[in-house]
Amino acid sequence: MQEALRLIFSDTRARPSADVEVPGFEADWSAATPSRGLPLTLRNLRKSFGDNSVLRGIDLHIPAGQFVTIVGRSGCGKSTLLRLIAGLDQPTAGNIGFGDDRLPGDVRVMFQEPRLLPWARVLANVEVGLGADRGSPDAKARAEEVLLEVGLTDKRDQWPAVLSGGQKQRVALARALVSRPRVLAFDEPLGALDALTRIAMQQLLERVWRDQGFTAILVTHDVAEAVALADRVLVIEDGRITNDVLIDLPRPRRRGSADLAALEGEILKQLLEGSEDSSEL
C-alpha cells in the first residue's frame, strides 16, 4: 500500500470524442487566470548513471505559468530531465530552483500509466492526491470539484477496472490537480491513447492549465502535440538543449494550420537530421 501511494505521489478546436466529453472545451480564452505557477531555473544540470552521461549541462529558465514542451529522440534525456525537476531523482551536478516560496506538494507529475489504486473507487483515487489533507473535512468536496473539472462527476463511484483508457487518464489528471500544484510535469501522459481521445485530452490539459495558472512541463514524442500546446518547445539531443522554439501563436490554436505546420516541420527537420548524424557515427 505504501509503495503504491509513493508512486502515485510522484504525480500538471475540434470537439472531443465520445470517450472524452470534456465540459467547457469552448472556454473564453480572453479570461485566462493570472499565473500562480512557480518559476523554474536549472543551472549546469548534469545526470550520469555510472559511466553513461545522460544530461550534459542543462541551463534553462522557465517563467511562472509558462507551458513548455520537451521533444527529442528516445534516449536523449527528456524523461530523466523531468524526473530531476519533479524530485524523483537527484542530479549528479548542478541545481534546480523554484523561486523562494515553494511548499511541499507544489510540484506534481502525471505519467503515461494512470497508476490508479484498483481497490479504490474513482473519488477515493482522486482524494489520494491530497496527501496529508486526505482526512480533512473538505477532502471529498475538493475531489468532487476537480472531477467536475475533468468531466467525470458521473464516474465518482465507479471502479477503475470499468473505465476506458481516456477516463483513467482523466482520473489521474484529477488526482494530480486536486492539491492545486504550482508546477505540473507530464511524462508522455497521452502516449497510449487513441488519436481522437488524445486530441480531446490535449484540449483538456490546455484548458486546466489556462484555468489554474500552473507552470506546465510536458515531455512528448509527438511534435504536433508539442507545438499545439506549448509557449516554448525545447529540443533535446544527446543530453543537451539544442533548440528553444518560441510558439508565438494565439490560443486556442487550430490544428493543421499553416503556422503550426511550419513550426512542426522546423522541429522535425532538426530531429531527423540529428538521427541521420547519429546513424553515421
Swiss-Prot record:
Q: Where does ATP bind?
A: 72-79
What Enzyme Commission number does this protein have? Answer: 7.6.2.14
- Give the membrane topology, semicolon-separated if more than one: Peripheral membrane protein
Gene Ontology CC, one term: plasma membrane
Q: Which cysteines are joined by disulfide bonds?
A: none
> Which stretches make up the ABC transporter domain?
40-263
Q: What is the lineage of its organism?
A: Bacteria, Pseudomonadati, Pseudomonadota, Alphaproteobacteria, Hyphomicrobiales
- Gene name as annotated: ssuB
Q: Which PANTHER family match?
A: ALIPHATIC SULFONATES IMPORT ATP-BINDING PROTEIN SSUB, TAURINE IMPORT ATP-BINDING PROTEIN-RELATED
Instruction: Give the protein's function.
Output: Part of the ABC transporter complex SsuABC involved in aliphatic sulfonates import. Responsible for energy coupling to the transport system.
Catalytic reactions of this protein: ATP + H2O + aliphatic sulfonate-[sulfonate-binding protein]Side 1 = ADP + phosphate + aliphatic sulfonateSide 2 + [sulfonate-binding protein]Side 1
Q: How does it assemble?
A: The complex is composed of two ATP-binding proteins (SsuB), two transmembrane proteins (SsuC) and a solute-binding protein (SsuA).
GO MF term set: ATP binding; ATP hydrolysis activity
Q: Which family does it belong to?
A: Belongs to the ABC transporter superfamily. Aliphatic sulfonates importer (TC 3.A.1.17.2) family.
Domain of life per record: Bacteria
Q: What is its main location?
A: membrane
Query: Any idea what this protein is called?
Result: Aliphatic sulfonates import ATP-binding protein SsuB
Q: Where in the cell is it found?
A: Cell inner membrane
Q: Which InterPro entries match?
A: AAA+_ATPase, ABC_transporter-like_ATP-bd, ABC_transporter-like_CS, ABC_transporter_ATP-bind, P-loop_NTPase
Could you tell me the keywords of this UniProt record?
Answer: ATP-binding, Cell inner membrane, Cell membrane, Membrane, Nucleotide-binding, Translocase, Transport
Extract the Pfam families matched here: ABC_tran (PF00005)
